[in-house]
């Protein structure tokens, strides 16, 4: 099947406007991370809607304990590998740690991910303090995905990988951050390790799609790290489900994940967090 046939068979490429339409129609987005051509192609065949080249590659590909050592050059390389495989899925690339400390630096590095890597959207961690950068990126035609809740690039500041937004003040701050990012021009938001009730409230409040990871089933879509889905992670997080451990091989695991997200059977209550 040619690339054009694949696009036609899957209903066309996933775009910002298509994701908004899916939110309006109540059709969940099935998203995964990917870091190379082979697995990205497998995700394409399984019908994954969005592929994130996450700085999580620092941990699952490079073997670091955190995402902090990942460089922009690393991200460009892996984004380029993934983008070559994608005809339908939206390609999103992370701005890694310390790559967007100022608006001009962030614009330059986001431009690299788009021009050199082939990304169609960039993701950055942070709330209202990133609004100026988000606005500048949007003005330059660069789609943006925000990231709130647990922000792995701040792991040392927050004291580990912990659920965020359980306290009322924290929940209110997260809502304000989400609204600020949307107002600045963000096109998508990822919520990580957030109480399910709060995540659903934010999903209903925002007009842009909200994708959860460890944020319950009330979001507009779900994303997991590929390695967790395939069951190759030694100690997977509690919000993940190892579809690959259920038998059938890589393609069966990816198809099962996509089907479960679209049917609303994943995540279950056991994969989320209470306030």
Curated annotation (Swiss-Prot):
Active-site residue numbers: 192 (proton acceptor)
Which EC class is this protein assigned?
Answer: transferase
Cofactor detail note = Binds 1 Mg(2+) ion per subunit.
Top-level division of the source organism's lineage: Bacteria
KW Ribonucleoprotein (keyword) present: no
One GO MF term: 3-methyl-2-oxobutanoate hydroxymethyltransferase activity
Disulfide bond sites: none
This protein's GO cellular component annotations are: cytoplasm
Keyword annotations for this protein, in alphabetical order, are: Cytoplasm, Magnesium, Metal-binding, Pantothenate biosynthesis, Transferase
Reaction catalysed by this enzyme: 3-methyl-2-oxobutanoate + (6R)-5,10-methylene-5,6,7,8-tetrahydrofolate + H2O = 2-dehydropantoate + (6S)-5,6,7,8-tetrahydrofolate
Q: What Enzyme Commission number(s) apply to this enzyme? A: 2.1.2.11
GO BP: any one term: pantothenate biosynthetic process
Similarity section: Belongs to the PanB family.
Q: What is the recorded name of this protein?
A: 3-methyl-2-oxobutanoate hydroxymethyltransferase
Q: Which organism is it from?
A: Halorhodospira halophila (strain DSM 244 / SL1)
């Amino acid at each position: 099947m040619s690339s054009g046939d694949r696009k036609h068979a899957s209903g066309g490429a996933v775009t910002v406007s298509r994701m908004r339409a899916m939110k309006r129609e109540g059709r969940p987005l099935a998203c995964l991370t990917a870091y190379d051509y082979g697995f990205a192609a497998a995700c394409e065949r399984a019908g994954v809607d969005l592929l994130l080249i996450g700085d999580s590659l620092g941990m699952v590909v490079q073997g670091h304990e955190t995402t902090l050592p990942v460089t922009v050059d690393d991200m460009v390389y892996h984004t380029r590998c993934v983008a070559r495989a994608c005809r339908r899925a939206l390609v999103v690339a992370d701005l890694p740690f310390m790559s967007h400390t100022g608006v001009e630096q962030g614009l330059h590095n986001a431009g690299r991910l788009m021009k050199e890597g082939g990304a169609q959207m960039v993701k950055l961690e942070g709330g209202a303090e990133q609004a100026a950068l988000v606005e500048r990126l949007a003005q330059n035609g660069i789609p943006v995905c925000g990231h709130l809740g647990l922000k792995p690039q701040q792991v040392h500041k927050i004291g580990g990988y912990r659920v965020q937004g359980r306290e009322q003040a924290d929940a209110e701050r997260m809502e304000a951050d989400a609204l600020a990012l949307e107002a600045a021009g963000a096109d998508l938001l990822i919520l990580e390790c957030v109480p399910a009730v709060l995540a659903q409230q934010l999903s209903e409040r925002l007009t842009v799609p909200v994708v959860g990871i460890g944020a319950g089933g009330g979001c507009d879509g779900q994303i997991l790290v590929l390695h967790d889905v395939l069951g190759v992670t030694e100690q997977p997080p509690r919000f993940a489900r190892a579809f690959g451990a259920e038998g059938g091989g890589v393609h069966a695991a990816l198809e099962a994940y996509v089907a479960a997200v679209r049917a609303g059977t994943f995540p279950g209550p056991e994969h989320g967090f209470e306030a």
